[in-house]
Amino acid sequence: MIKKRIAPLVLGLWALLFLFTFPAIAEDDPEDGKSTNDSGPLTFEGFLEMENLFNAHKDQSFDDAVIKNEIRGKFKIRYGTDNAHVFLSPDLYLSSAVFQSESDKTCAYNDDFDVARNMRISDRGYEASLSEGYVHYGNSRARVRVGNQIYGWGTADVFNPTSYFNPYDMRETFFKDDDELKLGVPSISGMAFFEKFTVEMVIVPVHIPGILAEDGRYWEIHLDNYQLPIVFDDVHALSGGIENSAFGARVSSTILGTDVSVSAYHGPDKDFVYLPSRILVEPGEPVSVLVTPKTYPVSFLGMDFSKSLDSFVFQAELAYSPDKRTTLAQNPDSGEPIVFPYTVERSDYIAYAVGFNYFIPMHEWIEGHEGDTVLTMEWYQTRFLNRSRTEPVITDFISARFEDSYFKGRVPVACTCLVSLKNPGYVIWPRIGYDFQNGFSTTLSYLHLDGRSEALNTTESLFYYFRNNDSLIWKLHYDF
């Protein structure tokens, strides 16, 4: 009941911010007295999208194959000038879970009504989120933003080791649109523009944890190669306080034609430590192990590079932490008793991603071909440098993506492949679309996932646990 009362209050506060705070700062640039905005004080754009997801597993009825029917509306609203404005980018979702029984959680956004710290309001069948919603004030020398923000730190296309602030929405693992994967964080950011470099500083006063697929969801992870069932506990945000705030800085420059950035961060780790906490013994349920997603503070130093060379754009990111937490490894097959909860220790840690974009000159081979043909490839690896630590699950990935369009841009095609080498598994994701060039477009894609388990009581590739989740996805999209 309290949270249901908070929701209108949150929306009301944003309305007051929009109506009253903005006029106080929406002045023309004090340096020259002229606005640089030629499109008027209010701009509004966005899209509406219908998404339908079907499980492609054989030997099931059509009703069982239908997993999700969802309507999404995304809006981008800006009021003000280039120098001083309010920017809002809300996402509104409505899914078929509204009409399903409470016992069917396959595509539910949340078990119950909830208001998150970043103003994401969700229930079983609907969700409203504000990934970006901030007040902007600046000029040619500097700018300041206050509100929900997403930070595009890093240069890699798939995995970004130096993107520290924005946690991931993993309710559909990687199989969401790019603009849905990162959660906005309430923060204050400032950027100063110097002649040869740019400095950005960020403060996030409250912790925003990532989101995982909960029990009963289509993309829930079933660790079915363990002798005892694994049950995941709920995710909890860290308490308020300066000790759980995040701070970061980034210096960017161009040196000899290469874009270079150096960054530093201290605050809550956006990656969870999956801590085996205790044995669960409940009446009528099998004995199982409770795993709790925990968040700990972490420090990072990072660098990223981007270099254009003929038809190639090369990218690299590197992040190092002296104090990233993980659990001490225990071997269930050693014959020694397992001690719960597992011990959590600090460790030196390194993560890097290297890759390139190749703009293929397809017009040289296909007469009249228009548009960009791009091949993107990337290698991603993480390591704990101290021995006896539990090894990272998301590591040793090769990704490849091919994108092109035909018939004057009406038919876009793409194929993405992500391969896990350390824990064998892969996903292949071909897509084809048609652009009616009147605002409407449609896409059809297929997800094929597979992997293998090499031993009991070991964590395998994510794709192994989703081996029965081959899916067909159809979308109808309208831009306005």
Regions found by a protein language model. Give the residues of each.
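Repeated loop/turn-to-beta-strand initiation elements of outer-membrane beta-barrel proteins
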Residues: N83-V86, R141-V144, K196-V199, G257-V260, ...
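Detector for outer-membrane/organellar transmembrane beta-barrel domains
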Residues: Y265-G267, S311-L328, P332-V419
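Outer membrane beta-barrel
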Residues: G80-E220, L447-S453
